[in-house]
Amino acid sequence: MAKDIKFSADARSSMVRGVDILANTVKVTLGPKGRNVVLEKSFGSPLITNDGVTIAKEIELEDHFENMGAKLVSEVASKTNDIAGDGTTTATVLTQAIVREGIKNVTAGANPIGIRRGIEAAVATAVEALKSNSVPVSNKEAIAQVAAVSSRSEKVGEYISEAMEKVGNDGVITIEESKGMETELDVVEGMQFDRGYLSQYMVTDNEKMVAELDNPYILITDKKISNIQEILPLLENILKTNRPLLIVADDVDGEALPTLVLNKIRGTFNVVAVKAPGFGDRRKAMLEDIAILTGGTVITDDLGLELKDATIEALGQASKVTVDKDSTVIVEGSGNPEAIANRVAVIKSQIESSTSEFDREKLQERLAKLSGGVAVIKVGAATETELKEMKLRIEDALNATRAAVEEGIVSGGGTAYINVLDAVAGLELAGDEGTGRNIVLRALEEPVRQIALNAGFEGSIVIDRLKNSEVGTGFNAATGEWVNMIEAGIIDPVKVTRSALQNAASVASLILTTEAVVANQPEPASPAPAMDPGMMGGMM
């Protein structure tokens, strides 16, 4: 395929047009008075959203050179979303500001490489200043504030802080669509896995169709149990203790299952059998997790263990187990806390080294099951369009909250960027590197300017007053008042704030140092097929 090539100023100006189109579309959503953007979908109702990365991903421009500029900014939003989970609109605004100021200087004859070095040095200084201004997030109220700011809903803030309190910072919090109109929180404490009882005759509550075992022993094996004789010695020993038994095995079939069911119905023995969760190597890992959580041992050929030789000492224990037709929940396992902590540390290191998104997600689920539980926020709304928009906001809020717990918070509303201006201005750089520093100084003002503009105020006036105010004082665009931002609950996670700036500077520098752009030539429209002469007979 033939290529179109543009050089120097012509190449950069084409890309900048694309940057501006995308950024101008996204930045109207910034701040508490940010507007919505309506996205046409190929089927179903349009999506109404103020989520920066969702909007950025939808934009495709006809001009190939402009589209490349737009896609680079979209990459900034996506990367910020991947790292911090929020701050995508801020990252887009910062990218546009750095590109706009940088292009003026490059066009005037400045060396783009020198400018790039200056930008990198200024951003590094700004990031260090942001980190030093950080306030740790330690209590439930602070977590609720972070979530409320991101989602623009105090109720959502309460749900997220409650969920994190219940399942811990490493716990799994999932967001699902509710069947009703109300948003609600459902917390499953303990370890849950998606395997239910193998026979409905094992239930202890016929009305709810669940089996509840109090203080049970837990047999954990990756073997298939077909012959009851294999576990008979173990069953006889458990029978003497008068305690129930949960069997987690590859499968229970043959004569073993009906024998267990018969003894359960007769009241001889309270037992529930479930299949082991997962598949392949993941199944082995999950069985090991269950064993560590409950203080048991996995009966497996890998360790040279046989079912017929198993003793009560090899069984796990828990305060309660609940099993329904689809899932099993183990509450308060009797495992050694130190062994559990070591297992958690191993899984965390696997998450960090994993390159697969799917593997990382599964490892995160295992981590949550070991360290707390699972919380589900069920989102309710009057219409499908509102539901989609609400779900996106809650996802952003959850990500922002996790980021806040990780690295702390700073004043929100763009104030944190104004508070680091002095640190950046104190950086002694000369020539084009000094120009790069000045570009960052101007760009750091842009989020506040845009938030004020979206709320109907003059950005320059707000910035001038901010520069002369005490550190921590900022402009509440929602009310038009000047307040202590952290005390007023207007806060941003440091991780979000710094990621937005770092990613914006990285991509903007690439655009400024671009000297040639290569794009595919548009394909010529195929000519209409010639008409069959026989079709013209009636036209004479």
Curated annotation (Swiss-Prot):
Matching PROSITE patterns: CHAPERONINS_CPN60
Function: Together with its co-chaperonin GroES, plays an essential role in assisting protein folding. The GroEL-GroES system forms a nano-cage that allows encapsulation of the non-native substrate proteins and provides a physical environment optimized to promote and accelerate protein folding.
Family per similarity comment: Belongs to the chaperonin (HSP60) family.
Gene3D superfamilies, alphabetized: GroEL, GroEL-like equatorial domain, TCP-1-like chaperonin intermediate domain
Disulfide bond entries: none
Protein name: Chaperonin GroEL
Cellular location(s): Cytoplasm
Pfam families linked: Cpn60_TCP1
Biological process annotations from GO: protein refolding
Organism of origin: Streptococcus sanguinis (strain SK36)
GO molecular function, one term: unfolded protein binding
EC number: 5.6.1.7
Assembly behavior: Forms a cylinder of 14 subunits composed of two heptameric rings stacked back-to-back. Interacts with the co-chaperonin GroES.
Superkingdom classification of source: Bacteria
Keyword Transcription regulation part of the UniProt annotation: no
Catalytic activity: ATP + H2O + a folded polypeptide = ADP + phosphate + an unfolded polypeptide
ATP-binding keyword on record: yes
Residues annotated as binding ATP: 29-32, 86-90, 413, 476-478, 492
